[in-house]
């Protein structure tokens, strides 16, 4: 079985003080709709949408038009706590060998090819993350001074989806359940648990929408508030 988890747990304060970015409308639909539509694929048994508790009802209202089975659950105080909530929600619904794909709700431009390659690599390796190679030289800095400059061919920019066998996620997140504030993405929790994580090639268009300017860069002109 394959399930998709889409994270909309934050309030998007960098985007707008008035409403979360998932409800911003462009090209006639809310950002949430654009993202979820990418996962209305036959391979997914069901989807889990993780929402800020204040917007669960609004999320349900937006998503009820889709025929796919979609559960809307409450998110946590951070991204990783939201992922952990989804992992616990899935405990009695799927088996340990099943595949769980986790995606940032603010990445509406993900495509089917990336999703399918994630699933394929998770089946092969147990854990995989979407990433693109860095075109820029990256420096490690401390106190405003450069400590080192890693080789560019070893630097990758992490995106989502991040996809795992359920047993890998469950083992990793329960192991670090009291230290999830130390992590910023799912793969770092899995790595800390001793698992290897493979790379699935992403693309530049699979950006995370953080500001209105990000949508303009993607060629979106008509943007309407939530």
Swiss-Prot record:
Catalytic function, reaction form: 2-C-methyl-D-erythritol 4-phosphate + CTP + H(+) = 4-CDP-2-C-methyl-D-erythritol + diphosphate
Q: Which domain of life is it from?
A: Bacteria
Q: Does the keyword Nucleotidyltransferase apply?
A: yes
For this protein, the record's CDD domains field holds: CDP-ME_synthetase
Give the EC number(s) listed in the UniProt record: 2.7.7.60
What Pfam families does this protein's entry cite? IspD
Site keyed Positions MEP for the nucleophilic attack: positions: 152, 208
Q: Name one GO biological process term.
A: isopentenyl diphosphate biosynthetic process, methylerythritol 4-phosphate pathway
Listed PANTHER family: 2-C-METHYL-D-ERYTHRITOL 4-PHOSPHATE CYTIDYLYLTRANSFERASE, CHLOROPLASTIC (PTHR32125), RIBITOL-5-PHOSPHATE CYTIDYLYLTRANSFERASE (PTHR32125:SF8)
Family recorded in the similarity comment: Belongs to the IspD/TarI cytidylyltransferase family. IspD subfamily.
Q: What is this protein called?
A: 2-C-methyl-D-erythritol 4-phosphate cytidylyltransferase
Question: Species name for this entry?
Answer: Thermosipho africanus (strain TCF52B)
Name the encoding gene, please: ispD
């Amino acid at each position: 079985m394959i399930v998709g988890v889409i994270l909309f747990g934050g309030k998007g304060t960098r985007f707008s003080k008035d409403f979360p970015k998932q409800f911003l409308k462009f090209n006639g639909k809310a950002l949430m709709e654009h993202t979820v539509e990418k996962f209305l694929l036959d391979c997914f048994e069901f989807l889990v949408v993780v929402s800020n508790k204040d917007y669960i009802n609004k999320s349900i209202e937006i998503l009820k038009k889709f025929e796919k089975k979609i559960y809307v659950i409450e998110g946590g105080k951070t991204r990783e706590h939201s992922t952990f909530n989804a992992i616990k929600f899935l405990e009695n619904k799927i088996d340990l060998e099943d595949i769980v794909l986790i995606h940032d709700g603010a990445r509406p431009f993900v495509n089917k090819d990336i999703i399918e390659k994630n699933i394929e690599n998770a089946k092969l390796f147990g854990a995989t993350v979407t990433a693109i190679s860095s075109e820029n030289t990256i420096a490690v800095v401390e106190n405003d001074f450069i400590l080192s400059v890693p080789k560019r061919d070893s630097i990758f920019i992490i995106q989502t989806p991040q996809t795992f066998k359920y047993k890998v996620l469950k083992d990793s997140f329960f192991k670090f359940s009291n230290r999830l504030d130390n992590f910023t993405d799912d793969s770092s929790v899995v790595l800390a648990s001793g698992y290897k994580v493979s790379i699935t090639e992403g693309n530049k268009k699979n950006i995370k929408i953080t500001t209105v300017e990000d949508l303009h860069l993607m060629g979106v002109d008509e943007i309407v508030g939530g």
